[in-house]
A protein has these predicted regions:
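Glycine-rich, low-complexity intrinsically disordered segments
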Residues: 1-162
């Protein structure tokens, strides 16, 4: 894994499963994450001791779009009947060929897209680097896999009707 090369974390999104082993993509396949948050929780028994399964959880994410056509994959996920993979790579490094060279840490989440909101800015940017389009998605999580430097840890999320 990469050594920390920045005090500011940079996160990118790839809609593939890093834990599958066949993780090949280029820098063009990545989207910049502006922000994301999620909350996982577990229940307590009658004595107040935490235990049991991790309950149903949501993740919200805002992603910068470089082209309007990039929103299609999120709308495809919205109508899909199976969970989609979303891999978040922190401080990724790419080689001169544009292929992934290294990354610091990563997290792959699986889930159903339940809400999509597009945001457009009326500000005109002189340089094309700051695209005025972003998309906000809400994902009902089914599984999370944390990819650390030494190993991966899986958190299965059980949906309950509570």
């Amino acid at each position: 894994m990469a050594d920390r090369f920045s005090t500011n974390l940079k996160a990118i999104l790839v809609m593939e499963d890093l834990s599958s082993g066949s993780f090949q993509f280029s820098q063009q396949d990545c989207l910049t994450i502006q922000d994301f948050h999620y909350c996982c929780n577990r229940g307590k028994n009658d004595e107040g001791i935490v235990g049991g399964v991790t309950g149903s959880s949501m993740m919200s994410m805002t992603v910068r779009l470089h082209e309007l056509s990039e929103n299609k994959r999120f709308y495809d996920g919205l109508i899909s009947r199976s969970p989609s993979p979303f891999t978040i790579l922190f401080n990724a490094e790419f080689g001169n060929d544009g292929k992934l060279k290294d990354y610091e840490n990563a997290m792959t989440v699986f889930g159903y897209i339940v809400d999509v909101q597009e945001h457009f800015s009326t500000l005109v940017s002189q340089d094309k680097a700051n695209a005025p389009m972003s998309i906000h998605i809400d994902i009902q999580l089914t599984k999370m896999v944390f990819h650390g430097k030494d190993s991966s840890k899986t958190l299965d999320i059980i949906h309950t009707d509570e």
